[in-house]
């Protein structure tokens, strides 16, 4: 493709390769945060919501307390008010509910515990009782994040000892006494200390956050909720503007909001997503091989099945001018790099 172009926001990264639509740029932006001082963990490890976004739960990995907030406006952290704190007696790294909130799952570094909740999503101590505990240390001794597929027949964890995602089958939905380990996939190339895991609603995207990269990595799965299928890393969204030690995150129901928490600030951070469930994406420049080939001046004439080889590059602000560059090296501009 000759004289091709791509649009990128300041601070973003644009990547070009020889494949269809092979460009990426951040589409999530940090929008707001809310701090709760004494009514918030000092070592926050995860943030989750009830099914309609009117309740929020934030865990503390050091004390085992889980803080419950009401939200007067659904999925709006600025409307949160403290309700109570549940003492789990468990070093909480991550949390999840079943679909109606009558089961609550709490993960520490080696075990997951299932709780019965008599009134869905009401974590008042009198409503909560522990029922089952399962040990996961055979797969990883530092489990950090947990989530389920939609019907509760699969559970996924991420561990920081081996930097892998682990998949388990549940013969009875949302019953951890019936789990069996099935598979794993390494995410070490992107994160060497992962802290949480989530999927989009249809299970075709997986997200991993971690404290080494200080970002959230987005992956696609060729088969929904199946890590034995082709798992492809799409890119990452930096969290350094909201917390330099990110530990947990969640989405709202339609994927237009991302919520993160971490252990550097005592707060929950809210991020807006331009495209639902897309932390890295492109707009306006992905018509074909090597950014944009929609213009007749930019068409490449080889079939898409052919190999495209870049033999020379030049750097500069004007066409036909500039200095010779090295093929295979990143081009550094005022606002980022072209790789």
Predicted regions and their residues:
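Short loop/turn segments immediately following beta-strands, especially the blade-tip
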Residues: 21-25, 70-78, 115-125, 168-177, ...
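A short beta-strand motif characteristic of beta-propeller blades
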Residues: 31-40, 81-87, 129-137, 180-188, ...
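Residue-level detector of Asp-centered blade-edge/turn motifs that repeat once per structural unit
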Residues: 51-52, 97-100, 150-151, 201-202, ...
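Short loop/turn segments immediately following the C-termini of beta-strands
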Residues: 61, 109, 160, 211, ...
């Amino acid at each position: 493709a000759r004289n091709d172009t791509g649009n990128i926001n300041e601070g973003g990264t644009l990547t070009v390769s020889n494949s269809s639509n092979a460009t990426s740029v951040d589409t999530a932006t940090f929008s707001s945060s809310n701090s709760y001082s004494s009514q918030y963990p000092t070592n926050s490890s995860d943030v989750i919501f009830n099914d309609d976004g009117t309740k929020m739960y934030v865990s503390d990995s050091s004390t085992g307390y889980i803080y419950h907030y009401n939200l007067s406006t659904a999925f709006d952290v600025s409307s949160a008010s403290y309700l109570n704190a549940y003492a789990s007696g468990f070093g909480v790294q991550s949390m999840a509910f079943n679909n109606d909130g009558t089961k609550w799952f709490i993960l520490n570094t080696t075990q997951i515990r299932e709780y019965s909740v008599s009134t869905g999503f009401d974590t008042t101590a009198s409503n909560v009782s522990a029922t089952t505990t399962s040990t996961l240390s055979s797969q990883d001794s530092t489990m950090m994040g947990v989530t389920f597929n939609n019907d509760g027949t699969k559970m996924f964890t991420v561990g920081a000892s081996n930097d892998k995602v682990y998949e388990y089958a549940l013969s009875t939905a949302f019953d951890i006494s019936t789990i069996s380990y099935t598979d794993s996939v390494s995410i070490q190339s992107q994160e060497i200390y992962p802290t949480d895991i989530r999927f989009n609603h249809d299970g075709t995207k997986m997200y991993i956050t971690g404290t080494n990269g200080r970002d959230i990595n987005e992956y696609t799965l060729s088969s929904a909720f199946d890590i034995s299928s082709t798992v492809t890393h799409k890119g990452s969204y930096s969290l350094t503007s909201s917390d330099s030690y990110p530990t947990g995150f969640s989405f709202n129901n339609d994927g237009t909001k991302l919520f993160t928490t971490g252990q550097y600030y005592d707060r929950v951070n809210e991020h807006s997503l331009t495209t639902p469930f897309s932390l890295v994406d492109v707009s306006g420049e992905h018509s074909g091989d090597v950014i944009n080939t929609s213009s007749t001046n930019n068409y490449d004439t080889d079939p898409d099945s052919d190999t495209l080889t870049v033999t020379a590059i030049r750097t500069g602000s004007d066409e036909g001018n500039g200095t010779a560059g090295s093929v295979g090296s990143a081009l550094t501009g005022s606002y980022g790099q072209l790789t």
